[in-house]
């Protein structure tokens, strides 16, 4: 199963049913059900978050120190509860997750949205890792990163470059 696709109420029951099916099958044969790790770049994002903060995704930084609370810092809930002033959505790989519909002003670093819905207030096009610039992508078993080369010349900046520029501008603004 793909954990990224289990985004519906009581999705854990699907996993439970798979586990019980495997248990039953293993009475007479050999069977396994292995999850495929995220296909939306979430593995790589989680690895980078852990590397940078010491904690996985869903870690708050508002106090200046990382605070890991997986249920409290779920982006869908933060936006729905009105606890955000701005949604900065990063999606450098075409066709992957797009920002949710929200009343919060949205900045999209990435490719043009393909889904229906209101466009973001600001969109900054960025290059695609492994095509427009080098990068890394974690294998679905999260054991090791795969190096990504550059396949074409592009004037589009990487997400890291854009975030660096935004950080510098915010520092200047005080």
Residue spans for each PLM region:
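Non-catalytic alpha/beta scaffold blocks inside enzyme catalytic domains
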Residues: 1-31, 38, 45, 52-174
């Amino acid at each position: 199963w793909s954990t990224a696709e289990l985004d519906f109420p009581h999705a854990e029951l699907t996993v439970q049913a798979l586990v019980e099916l495997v248990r039953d099958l293993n009475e007479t044969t050999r069977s396994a059900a292995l999850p495929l790790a995220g296909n939306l770049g979430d593995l790589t994002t989680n690895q980078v978050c852990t590397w940078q903060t010491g904690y996985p995704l869903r870690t708050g930084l508002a106090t200046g120190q990382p605070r890991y609370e997986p249920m409290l810092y779920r982006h869908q809930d933060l936006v729905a509860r009105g606890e955000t002033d701005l949604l900065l959505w990063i999606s450098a790989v075409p066709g992957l997750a797009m920002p949710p519909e929200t009343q919060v002003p949205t900045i999209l670093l990435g490719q043009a949205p393909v889904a229906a819905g209101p466009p973001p207030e600001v969109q900054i096009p960025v290059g695609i890792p492994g095509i427009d610039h080098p990068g890394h992508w974690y294998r679905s078993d999260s054991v090791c990163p795969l190096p990504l080369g550059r396949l074409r010349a592009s004037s589009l900046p990487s997400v890291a470059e854009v975030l660096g520029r935004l950080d510098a501008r915010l520092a200047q603004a005080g």
